[in-house]
UniProtKB/Swiss-Prot annotation:
Belongs to the AP2/ERF transcription factor family. ERF subfamily. This is Dehydration-responsive element-binding protein 1A. Residues 170-182 have a biased composition (Acidic residues). GO terms for cellular component: nucleus. It comes from Oryza sativa subsp. indica. The gene is DREB1A. Its main location: nucleus. Transcriptional activator that binds specifically to the DNA sequence 5'-[AG]CCGAC-3'. Binding to the C-repeat/DRE element mediates high salinity- and dehydration-inducible transcription. Confers resistance to high salt, cold and drought stress. InterPro entries: AP2/ERF_dom, AP2/ERF_dom_sf, DNA-bd_dom_sf, DRE1A-I. Residues 1-41, 155-188 are annotated as: Disordered. Residues 9-22, 155-167 have a biased composition (Low complexity). It comes from the Eukaryota. Keywords: Activator, DNA-binding, Nucleus, Stress response, Transcription, Transcription regulation.
Length: 238
């Protein structure tokens, strides 16, 4: 483990740096000169094409972060393995901000992967060992992603609660009312017709029955040829 050139006081501050001053002071990977290609030609390139201090580890798609300690030749600080390249890049920024604030980097400007890391990452302004820096970096990155998840959840909840329901237009309401009338009218009309036909049927039945009782029976029976038979037909003939 590399030693610390200048031992700082035990006082530490977890508040992020000022956004205005940090943005003017620190460079980012987007404004700094591009990274030089790796000198190794027989091995697969694992470094991230943009982010500093970040390289891929294995085929699982995970990323690791390791930074050079400014002012200490050949001294590197291992910061761990992360699920995303952004997590490793934020760890690099937190480490550089902590080392620079503690005087390990000479107090000058440092190159960051993200400009907003200067005020979004809560890093200590002093430390005693590089182990303290590693521990502070892990806490700063974890706190950053926790706050991001909370903000995203709050935004999703507020957007869903403020979304107004689509009002129904006059045409839709009129169409719904018309459909309701059409669906209810056949049943009522059918019941009305059945009642009317029932009353009319009974009236016709009683009228025809009374008319039949008033009619006289025929006076004589008719034969097969249509002539009337005047003689009575006996019931028995011997």
């Amino acid at each position: 483990m590399c030693g610390i050139k200048q031992e700082m006081s035990g006082e530490s501050s977890g508040s992020p740096c000022s956004s205005a001053s940090a943005e003017r002071q620190h460079q980012t990977v987007w404004t700094a000169p591009p990274k030089r290609p790796a000198g190794r030609t027989k091995f697969r390139e694992t470094r991230h094409p943009v982010f500093r201090g970040v390289r891929r580890r294995g085929n699982a798609g995970r990323w690791v972060c390791e930074v050079r300690v400014p002012g200490r030749r050949g001294c590197r600080l291992w910061l761990g393995t992360f699920d995303t390249a952004e997590g490793a890049a934020r760890a690099h920024d937190a480490a550089m901000l902590a080392i620079n604030a503690g005087g390990g980097g000479g107090g000058g400007a440092c190159c960051l992967n993200f400009a907003d890391s200067a005020w979004l990452l809560a890093v200590p302004r002093s430390y005693r060992t590089l182990a303290d820096v590693r521990h502070a970096v892990a806490e700063a990155v974890e706190d950053f992603f926790r706050r991001r998840l909370a903000d995203d959840a709050l935004s999703a909840t507020s957007s869903s609660s403020t979304t107004p329901s689509t009002p129904r237009t006059d045409d839709e309401e009129e169409s719904a009312a018309t459909d309701g009338d059409e669906s209810s009218s056949p049943a009522s009309d059918l019941a009305f017709e059945l009642d009317v036909l029932s009353d009319m049927g009974w009236d016709l039945y009683y009228a025809s029955l009374a008319q039949g009782m008033l009619m006289e029976p025929p006076s004589a029976a008719l034969g097969d040829d249509g002539d009337a038979i005047l003689a009575d037909v006996p019931l028995w003939s011997y």
